[in-house]
UniProtKB/Swiss-Prot annotation:
InterPro entries: DNA_Rcmb_RecR, Rcmb_RecR, Rcmb_RecR_Znf, TOPRIM_dom, TOPRIM_RecR. Transmembrane segments: none annotated. Keywords: DNA damage, DNA recombination, DNA repair, Metal-binding, Zinc, Zinc-finger. The keyword Kinase does not apply. The keyword DNA damage applies. Belongs to the RecR family. A zinc finger (C4-type) spans 58-75. Residues 82-177 form the Toprim domain. This is Recombination protein RecR. Pfam families: RecR_C, RecR_HhH, Toprim_4.
């Protein structure tokens, strides 16, 4: 059986690591890149290199830094410190920012509890979250997680973990279809879900 040259096989193997990209899609992308001008490929390689060395997260909220200011833009005093929104990924922060409904602070968990795979939350991040809540005393903690089994399990865990604090704990409701990830929810739907959040 005839095999692809190593440089194509290697590229396909890397592309397959991306979510939603199987062998056929990776193969298609690899052969599309063969048609690109070498300068475009070099520019892409440079962008990937810059991406790997330049991205940074805030040590306070774990959001992606969009500038070198400290605290980060999402932790600045210009935002409403009375509400803290818990999300799973830095991408979720930008999704909520597009909805223009939330002006408070964020905290990025990084991953969700998974009853199926046994995945746990980061103990280090939980400790930082506790310190932040106890130090800043927000009035409301909004759990903005995917409406999935993992999101439900994580939300329940957080509710139990912080039930000793005099803080309102709410979760996004109206407009968030069950089983759907933030990635597939538009800004208007997120805004409605935020407005319709319930005590949890």
């Amino acid at each position: 059986m005839l095999k692809y040259p190593d440089y194509i096989s290697k590229l396909i193997s890397f592309l397959k690591k991306l979510p939603g990209i199987g062998f056929k899609s990776a193969e298609k992308i690899a052969f599309e890149l063969l048609e690109w001008d070498p300068s475009q490929i070099e520019a892409m390689a440079l962008a990937l290199q810059e991406f790997s060395t330049s991205h940074a997260t805030c040590s306070n909220c774990f959001c992606l830094k969009i500038s070198q200011t400290s605290p980060c833009n999402f932790c600045s005093e210009s935002r409403d410190s009375s509400s803290l929104c818990i999300v799973a990924t830095p991408k979720d922060v930008f999704a909520l920012e597009k909805s223009k409904i939330f002006k408070g602070h964020y905290f990025v968990l990084g991953n969700l509890l998974s009853p199926i795979t046994g995945k746990h939350l980061s103990l280090e991040k939980l400790a930082i979250l506790k310190q932040r809540i106890e130090a800043c005393s927000p009035k409301e903690m909004i759990i903005a997680l995917d409406a999935t089994l993992e999101g439900d399990a994580t939300a329940l865990f957080l509710k139990q973990e912080f039930s000793y604090l005099p803080i309102k704990i709410s979760r996004l409701a109206l407009g968030m279809p069950v089983g759907l990830s933030f990635d597939f929810v538009d800004a208007n739907t997120l805004a409605r879900a935020f407005s319709g959040r319930n005590c949890f």
